[in-house]
Every structure is written in C-alpha cells, then in structure tokens.
Amino acid sequence: MPCFTVGLNTAKCLSSALGVPLYEFSHQAGHVAAAVYSSGHIELFDREFIAFHVSGGTTEALLVRPDEEKLLNIDIIGRTLDLNAGQAVDRVGVAMGLKFPAGAELEKLALKSQKVFKPKPCVKGTDCCLSGIENKCLDMIKSGEEQCDIALYCLDSVAAALEKMTKNILGKYGNLPLVFAGGVMSNSIIRQRFTKEFGAYFAEPAFSADNAAGTAYLTYLREQKNA
C-alpha cells in the first residue's frame, strides 16, 4: 500500500541521517506484537500461537511462530471472503444513523437489548463470509425493528462467525493459545464471550487498533538480540 511505502522511505532517510539501524517489520507483525505485549503474555513470543486481526481493513486468522530473523513468522490461515468485520459493523451503524466509525455506539445500543439471537454464520473451513450480516441488518432496519436489537444481532453475528472460525482452526492446528487484536476486538460483548469460551488473550482496548507500539516492541527485542 502507498501509505506503507511513504513510511518506509521516511524511516530509511532517518536511519541514514542518524546513522542508526533500520529494522523492518510487517503491518500484521506490529498488530500481533502490540496485542501480545498489552495482554501481558510476552512468553508467547517464544512459542507457536494463533492470532486474529479483526478490524475495518482486515479480518484474518494468523499462525504465528518464533523466527530468528523476523522475530515473528506469520502465515494467514483464515480470512473473510468478502466484507471485513469492521466494515460490516460500520455499514450497519451508519445505516442506523450513527457516526462513523460506529463500533462504540453500536456496542452501547446492543447492551440495551433483551433479545436472544442464534445467528447461523457463513463459514467455509477456516474462512468466513460476512456480507450476509449487513444484508440482514438492513432488512431489520427497513422492518422498523428496535435499534438496540439490530445492534446486538450485528455484533452477535460477527462473534458467531469468528467463533466458528476459531473452532475450525483449533481443530486443524491443535489447541494453541489465542490472541485477538484489531479495533473490532475491543468490543466488550465479543471479548467476554471469547474469554469465557476459549480463554483467549486480548489486546488492551488502547492497543487493539495500534501497531506502532508493537513495531516499537519488536525493535526493542531486536536490539536485545543484537546486544
């Protein structure tokens, strides 16, 4: 992406001008490292684990292994085949008249609902399709259903898809530790559900959408290795 190229070139210029080392890490590595660091479980850097990055721009499941050179070796093992989770949440929220990004306001509404939903997620192996969530919620809006119920259905449906993906991934790769990152995973409804069911680790809300802190921590680890 062009924005990453600009950042990389700026870093190269600063490295050259200051005479300091330049360490390159992927966008995903930054998010994963921020999540692991803020969860308080830095021991995961020394073992294999599963990480989910769930946001408006990404909905991916990652197999993460220690790597001598890159520190983290990351392979995508599951993903959305259409909408990202954050896109579905924001589109539904905006359609309801909420401000973009809509995640926080949608959560507040959902917590007021007394309904119990049992969504049927569209999951194919370790991949998911989330566009049906938006379509169903738009139908609910047109039908005049309560906004709090629509909000809860949306978030429950996202959680159900991620839950099914998680079960399929654990069945395929074994009972590995789980780490969740990305703005969508700062949602308290989803966090409580996954903590209870899987014992998953989460980035602190302030770090959920942050990868700069993760990149800084990876740089620290690299410096420690080189010392």
Per-region residue spans from a language model:
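Short beta-strand-loop/turn "lid" adjacent to the catalytic site in phosphate-handling enzymes
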Residues: 1-12, 16
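A short glycine/serine-rich beta->alpha loop
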Residues: 1, 75-80, 122-126, 201-208
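A contiguous, well-structured pocket-lining segment that forms one wall/lid of small-molecule binding clefts
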Residues: 104-178, 184-195, 199-201, 220-227
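Glycine-rich phosphate-binding/hydrolytic loop that grips phosphoryl groups
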Residues: 31-35, 203-227
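Short beta-strand scaffold segments in enzyme catalytic cores
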Residues: 33, 51-53, 59-63
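Glycine-rich phosphate-binding loop plus the immediately following alpha-helix
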Residues: 29, 65-112, 139-144
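Conserved phosphate-binding catalytic cores of ATP/NTP-utilizing and phosphoryl-transfer enzymes
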Residues: 25-49, 218
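Active-site nucleophile and cofactor-binding loops and adjacent substrate-binding regions
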Residues: 6, 22-30, 53-54, 80-83, ...
